Regions:
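Aromatic-lined, polymer-binding surfaces characteristic
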Residues: 90-180, 184-191, 195-215
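Terminal, non-catalytic domain-edge segments
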Residues: 183, 187, 210-351
């Protein structure tokens, strides 16, 4: 909680754009911890959309949990980001989520949809404004209109959306999204372990979404076939984790090249930790809660805590830790200077 509070304060004070470019007004952007400046380019992994949504989700969750000292300042910042999101990234009427500010969707990417759903859900939970809940539903519907049934989305908030629609008395929307989620889980069960390639050919964050989607649908429906389907995926997911006595590695899913794509140094190599590793922890803890298997609860907690080393005492953060001593003859073993997309790691710890 202390790390989250300091991180949120840093984002509000240092990572929100208030300059002359109208298109970026209110955006949360990557930050260069060496030069102490904001970073934004049209390049996918450094733009004002996509994974950077995690900063908005983090601040919304921290506000709900009363973690922030200057609540008024943080809430005003989030309002500005919310306005940016609606103005530059999302068509709230249709549910379209764009890849970059300026409503630029020249690069089509389904991964952006569940993050937008999560952001608007957290805003609904914080402010109680029904339009945010409705927007989350429209984005979900748009995701599935674009063949989302065969996609492996990271952070699709199935249970949360169903719960919030139930609380709000939106029974028609609840039935609609439940049917969509069920079809998605059925499709992933049918595919089984014959995983299709995504942005990379095969990785932990293809297997984990399969397990998580199916397991969440089990939580929503109680149908045993979804538990069995999720267990098939979890058996594969476990293969990405080790139990080495090193905080970089223990229950940290193997990932590689994330520092190259999202970092300043652009170095290839294994990233231990990388924040998406903690997605395994989310799935393990959900499985433990639904089955009573305490071993998975412990493993899940270790996985979630494993990414906290990416956040520092002064509120700064790193997008990845390059674990090898050297990569292609270049010295590694360092935390990349860019704070970029890592805040999902804290979001998971506040969930």
């Amino acid at each position: 909680e202390t790390l989250a509070a300091k991180r949120c304060a840093f984002i509000v004070d240092h990572q929100q754009y208030h300059g002359k470019i109208k298109e970026l007004q209110g955006a949360y952007l990557p930050y260069d911890n060496e030069e102490k400046i904001l970073v934004c380019t049209p390049e996918n992994d450094f733009n004002a959309g996509r994974e950077r949504t995690g900063m908005g989700v983090l601040i919304a969750r921290a506000l709900q949990q009363n973690l922030l000292k200057d609540r008024e300042k943080a809430e005003q910042s989030l309002r500005e980001y919310h306005a940016f999101y609606l103005r530059e990234l999302v068509n709230a009427a249709t549910g379209l989520v764009c890849n970059c500010s300026g409503k630029d969707n020249s690069y089509f990417r389904l991964y952006n949809y569940p993050w937008a759903v999560t952001f608007f859900l957290e805003c609904w939970k914080l402010w109680g404004e029904k339009e945010n809940l409705k927007t989350a539903v429209r984005i979900t519907e748009k995701f599935y209109e674009q063949d989302g049934f065969r996609f492996y989305p990271i952070e699709m908030p199935i249970v949360m959306l169903c719960q919030e629609l139930e609380k709000a008395g939106e029974q028609e929307d609840l039935k609609t999204v439940r049917d969509l989620f069920r079809r998605h889980a059925d499709q992933l069960i049918e595919i089984g372990t014959a995983y299709p390639a995504s942005e990379v050919n095969y990785e932990q964050s293809i297997v984990q979404p399969a397990a998580e989607v199916i397991l969440q649908v089990y939580e929503v429906t109680g149908e045993e076939k979804y538990l069995r389907g999720a267990e098939q995926q979890i058996a594969v997911l476990e293969l990405f984790d080790g139990q080495q006595p090193d905080y970089h590695l223990h229950e940290t899913a193997i990932r590689h090249w994330d520092g190259y794509w999202f970092g300043k140094r652009r170095v290839f190599g294994d990233t231990f930790p990388h924040y998406w590793s903690a997605e395994n922890g989310r799935t393990f803890k959900r499985y433990a809660r639904l089955t009573g298997n305490e071993e998975y609860n412990i493993r899940g907690e270790h996985s979630l805590r494993g990414v906290l080393s990416m956040f520092f005492e002064d509120g700064t953060a790193t997008c990845a830790y390059l674990y090898p001593y050297s990569v292609n003859g270049q010295k590694a073993d360092f935390a990349d200077p860019y704070a970029n997309d890592q805040d999902w790691g804290l979001c998971m710890n506040l969930e």
